[in-house]
Structure formats: structure tokens, C-alpha cells
């Protein structure tokens, strides 16, 4: 059977109740779709004597009243319903409790780390690479490994996780070569977030991270996105076979965000004073840079972190249930899911249902708390720079626009060149960016790939531009201005932004 997926083009308000009404819906032949007899009975006030229908009448009459007040005639409706968005406490209460307990532990007992390798000139553009582990209290069951879930000491549904044993969390840092070339340079502390099911070592093999470190004078450190890192691939595959275990991914993703918060704390409490860093001087506000999954998770980290003010999110988005079916990356994983859930309709519904848990572990549950209503213990001056690749095969630009609207971002104009967007008004709902702005901005980088399909399928024509914005020094110069100088600079000369295709 066909399935109609309706996705709001903006993030809905936490805890609010919404009424939805459907009218004018036709099939592929252009014929009006008849509403169900049960809905007609409710809509037209027909008594059925059926408890399952009559028990819903008061609720539905209230919904019809709301629609009527909005100028929508109930007689033409084919379907209507109400729903309530998860509250801020439901979405963020667990992670804030875990963050606060973790920071308390760090202040009283933490700060221990072990350097396991020091590699001078690991690359031509790196002065020294330092890898190791840091000790951290764990809020997962067991040893916090993939497949574990949050640790509770109560069956109370409102309980928050409690500490378990202390574990070792990996990290890797790179001192950029520019620190050798200018001994008086004070580097900024930065965190880097890796891509899909990757590792902290993306900081090394990702040439864009090393390049930005040198161009902007940032000493980047990275850890794993626990729950969505390379060591989680096995549990991700097991979850695709049996989604009843999905909570283990969602819980560990929240632990992973807190691990980044802890690494940020360690950055400011002695890590870079270790002799292995070669005396590099590091000072200033902590900044964040991440790509792909690092862009998806980065908005959650930005909302939760007590230290990060400015973040660059490369090829970003929010809401995995929207992203996956439009991503070429999901093809392999959907093949794992298919034997257990052979219907595409069923798979789509499952991904939509588990988004209620996923919201707690990715940006979708947090973007309402960046431009306004900051979460407890966080800064109120947060700003995001979204760098979007037009026609991206892996992270649909649709979700980046939704996130940008949520944080009140402005958009670089012209958004794209004439004829390069399927939107009637490209960048609708966003005000034009102004040179020197210090708030959130979204910029669309066009490297010549075909615009994304209208249908909910991955792009498949021309080439994938996913890597292009980060690999071009022009977009990176904009990143530098945003992160270091706290301002937006139009590096496109007042024209639509172009990125060179990656090699």
C-alpha cells in the first residue's frame, strides 16, 4: 500500500499540541480519496453506537473546532488528528542530568588522562599528533560498550541515569604546523566531530580539518560519537535486524555527546599543558567543527555544551528519519533491515517511530535551544554556520534548511544561481544574511551537481558534492571568520556561492 509521509518544514515547539487536517487529497488518477466511514461519522456528527469511535468524539470535536477557527471547513476534511510534541524535559532531561553529574565528577575526581602515542610530523601540515585516553564516569550499563543502555537505579519512568563505573574514553589531538612557523601564535581550542560511523582519527585523514587548523590557528581534538562510531557498527546492524533494541543506540548517542562535553572540559583543564603538545599555547573560547554526522550531532552538542559558543556544521541536517531514506549511505543498511522488515512501508514507519528516541541523541531534539530558550548551564550567545552542498547525496539539504529556520539563521543571498533550485523561492522563510552578522547563517555551496529529487529518494545523477565545501579553501576562509572573528563574511562577492569539486 502507498504511504503518505508528511514532514513539517520547521521544527515544532517542545510540548505543544498540534491539530492536523487533510483535504484535497487525490490518488494518482486525480480522483478524490474517500475518508473512512469512522472518520465520516466523527466529522459529520453521526452517532454510531460503537465505543471505539464514540470514545474519541470529544477529542475530535475539539480538533474540528480548532480547524474551523483557522478557517478550515470540517465538511471537506478527509482526515484529521491531534498530536503533542515531546516536552523539553522529555527530550533533554536525561542528557542534562548526565552532563551535570559528569561535570561534578570531573571537578571533584576527574582530569586524569594517559597519552598513548606522540607522533611528531604525523603529516606535513601537523607539528605533532597526540593520542590517548581520558578517565570518565560512565552512565551506561556494563562498561558502556555498544549494546548497553542508560544505567538507572529506579523503575520510575521519570528517573534520570546514574553513574556506573569509570571508563577510558579515546581522544586524538593535532597541533597544526603553523604553531612551529609562528612561535608567538596563540591557538584556539577546538573540537572536531567525525562523520557517519567513523572515528576520532578522521581528524587525521580528513585533510580539511588539518587545513582549517592551520588556516584559522585552531588546535583540534576529537573523540568518538559513541553510539554512532565505527565500534558501534555491529550494534547498529543488530538494531536494523531487531528495532526493539534501538534504545541502546539512542542512549549511547547521548553518552557520546557528554563525552565531547567532557573532552571540552579537559581541553581547558590541563590536557594541552602536557609536554607531548610541545609547548603550544592554547587559549580562548572553545569552538566546534564537524561534517556530515558531525554536522547532524553538532547542533546537539552546541545546545548542551556549557563552553561552546560558535560551531561550523558542514553538510549538516537533523532528524534521521527524514535523512536516511534520502541518503545513498542508507542503501547498505536498509539491505540489512529488509529481511526482518520486508515492506518499505513498514521500514519507513519504523524509522519514523524511533525518531522519538533518536531526537534525544541528535540535533533534532535540541535546535529549539540554540537561538533562544538555552538549556540550563549553557551559554546564551550560541551561533551556527551551516555549510550545505547543493545536491548532496548523503545528507539532504532539506533538513539543513529546517534546522536553520529553527535557530533563526539568516541565509546568504543569492541563495543559488537562477535555475539551480527546485524550490519556488529558494531559502524561503530565512532572512538575507548581512556582512558582519554575528548570529547563525546558512550558506549553500554549488559545485555543479544536479539538484536533489523532489521524491523521498536519494539523488543518483551527476556526482555527489558531499565533500566539496570543506575541501575548498574559500568556504574554509568563511569558517575562519565565523569561528575566530565572530562574524559572517561574504566570500562569494555578492553572488551565489560556488565550491570547486573535490578531486
Q: What would you call each of these model-derived segments?
A:
Residues 266, 271-325:
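Primarily recognizes the serine-hydrolase "nucleophile elbow" in alpha/beta-hydrolase
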Residues 1-137, 141-144:
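Acidic, low-complexity Ser/Thr/Gly/Pro-rich repeat segments typical of extracellular/periplasmic
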Residues 9-13, 162, 174-185, 211, ...:
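Surface-exposed acidic, glycine-flexible loop patches that form ligand/cofactor-binding
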Residues 252-255, 309-503:
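C-terminal subdomain of alpha/beta-hydrolase-fold enzymes, centered on the catalytic histidine
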Residues 144-168, 181-277:
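Cap/lid segment of the alpha/beta-hydrolase catalytic domain
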Residues 84, 189-192, 219-224, 287-289, ...:
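Structural recognition of the beta-strand scaffold that forms the well-ordered cores
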Residues 140-141, 180, 196-201, 227-232, ...:
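Flexible loop/turn segments at secondary-structure boundaries
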Residues 17-21, 28-39, 94-97, 142-147, ...:
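Short, solvent-exposed loop/turn and secondary-structure capping segments
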